Amino acid sequence: MSVTVKRIIDSTVIVPKLPANEDPVEYPADYFRKSKEIPLYINTTKSLSDLRGYVYQGLKSGNVSIIHVNSYLYGALKDIRGKLDKDWSSFGINIGKAGDTIGIFDLVSVKALDGVLPDGVSDASRTSADDKWLPLYLLGLYRVGRTQMPEYRKKLMDGLTNQCKMINEQFEPLVPEGRDIFDVWGNDSNYTKIVAAVDMFFHMFKKHECASFRYGTIVSRFKDCAALATFGHLCKITGMSTEDVTTWILNREVADEMVQMMLPGQEIDKADSYMPYLIDFGLSSKSPYSSVKNPAFHFWGQLTALLLRSTRARNARQPDDIEYTSLTTAGLLYAYAVGSSADLAQQFCVGDNKYTPDDSTGGLTTNAPPQGRDVVEWLGWFEDQNRKPTPDMMQYAKRAVMSLQGLREKTIGKYAKSEFDK
């Protein structure tokens, strides 16, 4: 129901609205309600031998076709199999039964790609031995191409080279340093579906002899799910359950985004689901779990984690156009509550030698903060402080950030440093 606003001078009634300039989020379960398959379009008109040469020479010349890459990957990987030790299903799709032997492309529905296959340069010197490392290299370039930071990019490329050399000692990189022809491969939906299928398969068969192919594909898992990762990180850094962490959400925007992320039926907590690959499988064009669609939650969670001395949180992206003041206060209060209390209790005993706390002793002075992590107690105390951070809270935050150095712009670490280390 729309809320109307009345102009005082002449009683004109208006209904304030903002332009709908953002696409709505798309959930993976909705995709499978409309379709029971994930189509993968592959050209299968050329032999694996031809495709191997096309890809090898194309990489060396800097003129490789993504259609050749996809067709080669399909040809080289389609016979890789794994035997299930349990039933495997996701979103009502029966992938396989316990005891079944399945392949990577049983996760998708392979269809013929229409059109003429681009020309390629053959290379008769390439053999089936290349199929042990060339797929790893092609899939690894996906991970390298996702980052634009030169130092990290070089680190990933060096790691990929080492992975390939473990299979073939004579391996030499086919793409010269500085060439970025593979950066755009991530825009090809068939390539990303292969990446997702490979990672999902080897996530199930972690001990498979070809599981090292995940070096490049692992970033496909939970792609565009940064806010969901923030939630998991916050649970770990606080040592609190998902339920207890949720009770510490004190801002309407954060609560709205939490409701958005926790929509039932999405298989978030099912490890062998299609859900972690919702972007690369094309199940969603707008992830409900990204930091872009959950900026307030992401900021609040990462700021709290940073104030609890998380090294990972320092480089988390700082969102734009959010209500920083309230979110900062909420994060500070939560971090202060966790950082000021130790969740200690005897876990084992010998015989009956157990410590029993005496709840009848002690008590709080007027301004003393609570000793536990109960959000109700902390909110009551915060009300007594006129809902403003106390000097001790500000000192706590300053101690948490004062040693941070080399911070990048537009990061949570940079924001917290400027906010608390004054």
From Swiss-Prot:
Q: Where are the transmembrane segments?
A: none
Q: Where does RNA bind?
A: R143, Y152, K206, R214, K286, R317, R408
Q: Does the keyword Repressor apply?
A: no
Please provide the record's keywords in A-Z order. Capsid protein, Helical capsid protein, Host cytoplasm, Ribonucleoprotein, RNA-binding, Viral nucleoprotein, Virion
The domain of life for this entry's organism is: Viruses
SUPFAM superfamilies from the xrefs? Rhabdovirus nucleoprotein-like
What GO molecular functions are on record for this protein? RNA binding
Kindly give the InterPro entries that the UniProt entry links to this protein. Answer: Rhabdo_ncapsid, Rhabdovirus_ncapsid_C, Rhabdovirus_ncapsid_N, Rhabdovirus_nucleoprotein-like
Annotated region described as Interaction with the phosphoprotein, given as residue ranges: 350-390
Is RNA-binding included in the keywords of this UniProt record? yes
Q: Which GO terms describe its cellular component?
A: helical viral capsid; host cell cytoplasm; ribonucleoprotein complex; viral nucleocapsid
> Where does the UniProt annotation locate this protein?
Virion; Host cytoplasm
Oligomeric and partner information: Homomultimerizes to form the nucleocapsid. Binds to viral genomic RNA; this interaction contributes to the virion assembly. N in the nucleocapsid interacts (via C-terminus) with the P protein (via C-terminus); this interaction allows to package the L polymerase in the virion and positions the polymerase on the template, since P acts as a bridge between N and L. N(0) interacts with the P protein; this interaction prevents the uncontrolled aggregation of N(0). Interacts with the matrix protein (inner layer); this interaction contributes to the virion assembly. Interacts with the L polymerase.
Q: Which family does it belong to?
A: Belongs to the vesiculovirus nucleocapsid protein family.
User: Which function does this protein serve?
Assistant: Encapsidates the genome in a ratio of one N per nine ribonucleotides, protecting it from nucleases. The encapsidated genomic RNA is termed the NC and serves as template for transcription and replication. The nucleocapsid is bullet-shaped with the tip containing 8 turns of a conical spiral before reaching the helical cylindrical trunk. Nucleocapsid assembly is concomitant with replication, therefore viral replication depends on the intracellular concentration of free N, termed N(0). All replicative products are resistant to nucleases.
- Which protein are we looking at? Nucleoprotein
Organism for this UniProt entry: Vesicular stomatitis Indiana virus (strain 85CLB South America) (VSIV)
